[in-house]
Amino acid sequence: MSHHVHPYSHRLGIIRDWKSRWFGVNKQFRNYFKADVLLREYLEKRLKGMYVAGIEMERSEKTLRVIIATSRPGMIIGRSGEGANKLREDVVKFMTRYNLEQSPELKIDIQEIKSPESNAQIVAQMIAEGLEKRMAFRRVMKQTIEKVMANRDVQGIKIYLGGRLGGADM
């Protein structure tokens, strides 16, 4: 019997990059790793519904740079940058509350995804949002397929839905 390897690990270095980029030794490595995992979980909860495709972290000796890729940067940034400043303050509070390894300087960069229909993570969030609004699952799937296939970059789409949809077992 063979073991299954996650496809993401095969793509690393070829078409994908690491989600965290830093170097640490022994105890420092453990602290950095714990900080990255907890901070990523916190940001995913905090930014739920804002179509965040990915969160990357880069660490150097003096800075921690958090890169948030989203299709709706205006929702995160807010009016005149108020939302970004509030997010930065919340991250600093979170890191001090859990005694996480802190860098002297924290930078939060927000990248816009130009075509959200070609990003699988955002498409999945759109489907989940439609289902949470109690829309019919067949309609949600058909609308999503039409929306995604209208994008020229996309060659095809495969959607898998499971569970009790419409009150029936699937």
Task: Please report, for each region that a protein language model flagged, where it lies by residue.
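RNA-contacting regions in translation and RNA-metabolism proteins
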Residues: 1-170
